[in-house]
Amino acid sequence: TGTPRKKSGIPKKTGNPEDTAESTGAQEAKHKAGVDARIVRFLKKHHVLTLATSGEGAPYCSNAFYCYDAERNLLIFTSDMATRHAQQMARNPCVAASVVLETKVVGRVEGLQLCGKAARADEAARRAYLRRFPYAALAELTLWAIAPDFMKFTDNTLGFGKKLIWNNR
């Protein structure tokens, strides 16, 4: 929210409460793209995202099963070209998405919001998706991949409202 961030994805210390939670784990090994390992673990643990697209003068949301390719920092999902969101992505690849842990326990709240570009997925993405969802091999798939350029992970296990920011804009 207007807080300056380094291109590497490691936030600057500004004293802003929205800044990332600093802890002994904050210096843990980073993913190739500089994504904090806690974000990678969260994305790998879950499998449903809410996708936001825009077109025809209005935003639109849909849900999809996804797999996370940590090596390439891609969220891969399937969507038929006849769907409203696929048609919108084909015209405007700028998307947003969220992944949440549904819980009533405030101290366990976790959720990720991201922005990025969506494009048709390649063969490597297809293999990754089928490893996660083998039954999908029975269907004709139109796969998409989101390459995030910004992620904000809220993790109340680090303290109420603590956030980790990854920014590659």
Predicted regions mapped to residue ranges:
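Short beta-strand segments
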Residues: H46-M81, M89, V95-V100
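Short acidic (Asp/Glu) patches
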Residues: S79-T83, A96-L101, E123-Y135
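Alpha-helix boundary recognition
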Residues: L43-K44, A90, L130
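Charged, gly/pro-rich active-site loop segments
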Residues: E28-H31, V106-R169
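Helix-adjacent hinge/juxtasegments
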Residues: R84-L112, G116
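Short, basic and Ser/Thr-rich N-terminal targeting/leader segments
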Residues: K45-H47, Y60-S62, L112, A137-E140
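Extreme N-terminal tail/first-helix region
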Residues: T1-K6, K12-K13, P17-V48
